[in-house]
Amino acid sequence: YLNLRRSQPTSYMALINTGKSFILSLSPELFFRRQGKIITTRPMKGTSCRGFSLDEDNKNRQELTKDTKIKAENLMIVDLLRNDLGRIAQKVCVPQLFQIDIYRTLYQMTSTIEGKLSKEDIKIKDIFTSLFPSGSVTGAPKIKTMDIIHSLEKEPRGIYTGAIGYISPENDACFNVAIRTIFLNGGKVELGIGGGIVDDSVEKYEYEEALLKAKFLTEKFWKYFSFTTIR
């Protein structure tokens, strides 16, 4: 876990020791954060690999920024989460749209949605009832998509695409979306990876994107290098 933290630092990491197994989460995605009456969610939709030269790296970032298919998918999730948040919050807004986050092995497109909880006594379970699972996992329409996933997948996902987080004594909370999350049980290691399929998805590219998301674990850490431009 410490090696992965150093090699692939992300914002919503977690380590859980159940006594019989371990969960190592290197999730870069915020499911929701509650701070007082403010609730924030930050869905992630859109992935591109880093380049092996400065020119290639900049090119990959620009292509992700301009990709109309990915932006349409991201906007679909934003609209879905605005609707989900609207059940428990007022003044729902989108302060950041199509932001590019930089990681050692890839770029990710994210957007931020915020709202003000409509009641003082809204509990964490009410938030989960409205938001879970994350719209970035299901796509839209949410219930129909979940029915399709259930009919296609023959085994439960376990922790994968669930949520890991904490609740403070003041009832503030922060939970990730359990992607890039490893389950260790005895000598067995599980890592769930996947992606969203839409009408104009290309099978080859979707498969390559799924493998890219697993590179933090499947390839040697020293293979990766990155460029940072300071302005």
Residue ranges of model-derived segments:
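Extended alpha-helical targeting/anchoring segments
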Residues: 1-231
